[in-house]
Amino acid sequence: MAAPISTVAESKELRGLNLIAAHSHIRGLGVDVDSLQPRPASQGLVGQEKARKAAAVILQMVKEGKIAGRAVLIAGPPSTGKTAIAMGMAQSLGPDVPFTMLAASEIFSMEMSKTEALTQAFRKSIGVRIKEESEIIEGEVVEIQIDRSVTGGNKQGKLTIKTTDMETIYDMGTKMIDSMTKERVMAGDIISIDKSSGKITKLGRSYARSRDYDAMGADVKFVQCPEGELQVRKEIVHTVSLHEIDVINSRSQGFLALFSGDTGEIRSEVRDQINVKVAEWKEEGKAEIIPGVLFIDEVHMLDIECYSYINRALEAELAPIVIMASNRGHSRIRGTTYNSPHGLPLDFLDRVVIVSTQHYSADEIRQILAIRAQEEEIDLSPDALALLTKIGQESNLRYASNIITTSHLLSQKRKAKEVSVDDVQRSYRLFYDPARSVKFVNQYEQRFIGDQGNVNFTASNGDAMEIS
């Protein structure tokens, strides 16, 4: 007798781009919506309550559209959560308010001038909410009849569609039949047809047809049959940035440049025409300007010409809120021989509202490391977390969060369920923090190649061919 054949169904789950970054655990600013009071630890942010309260006040004014053309500087030592606060603001703004994030070094390019890169960043941070009314046919498909010609000519058909109150038959042409076939529309589907563009949107399947099949796919969505008239007027809102409008109007390839990224230099005449047109739409009530947020990290890397441009751009009618971060104290302004606080020119510093960040306490470092471990799905023993907290205090928070991952890899090698103190100690010995690296360089300085390319070979352990 033949042995029974057993089959095992295998399914591969498609994973998206779900990488864990340095600030992927941040979900918002962690403040109370009504009072704007920061919670001690919420939405991935811990501590820095004064800075978070200041950021929440700015955020509230952005949402209400009461503030634009202002500059805010988040200043503080390294590893005090400056970028984290900016990421929290981006998460709290929502999808409609534009938020552009760039590092100061990104604007230096051989293909594009510095002022053009800054202009594009400013324009990306200003949104235009365009309202348009369109006539839509919305209802449940009762029947689709398609008459195909024997000679392969034009197809013709009839669509019977209904709501709970009425039923109508529409004649369909070739393009509409092709769209129906592409969307796989069948009797019992709830669809929406835009009369101006002919776009068909499949909203779901009618509850009345829920018993048509015994088995349904996970993507099948059941909705109620629409009520009232078949043809309704709906207001559709599109939110685009000024930069996107610039690109579409500046090149022969139009919107394709948005996907390729090859926008190049955009002429100022094009931008002026768009500004005039947007102002007309605003007066007619067709559009609404949404001033967004431009965040420039490591702002001390900008040079004096960039600061001069930002000075002027902040005074323009269409200007976003510019939030900057710097970890410098008294530093030289790039392009000059002058020293200035935070590396910013004094005339620009006068226009800036400064928010300061402080060093984290031991308890706050412990909470942040626990959140990071939870985000990376790593189990830490209490002793390991205590040791990491001590390392974070003595070295810096970034180094402590980095060796969480390496300690986890070491614990996996010995098939442990959680990271122990021994794993953290081994990682600490394997990977140097900045302080120990500097100590090592100072100790063996003569063996390293210097600025002039010199190296002292006599400082080595001796020649292998030396005869005593």
UniProtKB/Swiss-Prot annotation:
One GO term (biological process): rRNA processing
Location in the cell: Nucleus
Residues that coordinate or bind ATP: G76, P77, P78, S79, T80, G81, K82, T83
GO molecular function, one term: 5'-3' DNA helicase activity
Pfam families recorded: TIP49, TIP49_C
UniProt family annotation: Belongs to the RuvB family.
Subunit annotation: May form heterododecamers with RVB1. Component of the SWR1 chromatin remodeling complex, the INO80 chromatin remodeling complex, and of the R2TP complex.
Protein role: DNA helicase which participates in several chromatin remodeling complexes, including the SWR1 and the INO80 complexes. The SWR1 complex mediates the ATP-dependent exchange of histone H2A for the H2A variant HZT1 leading to transcriptional regulation of selected genes by chromatin remodeling. The INO80 complex remodels chromatin by shifting nucleosomes and is involved in DNA repair. Also involved in pre-rRNA processing.
Name under which the protein is recorded: RuvB-like helicase 2
UniProt lineage: Eukaryota, Fungi, Dikarya, Ascomycota, Pezizomycotina
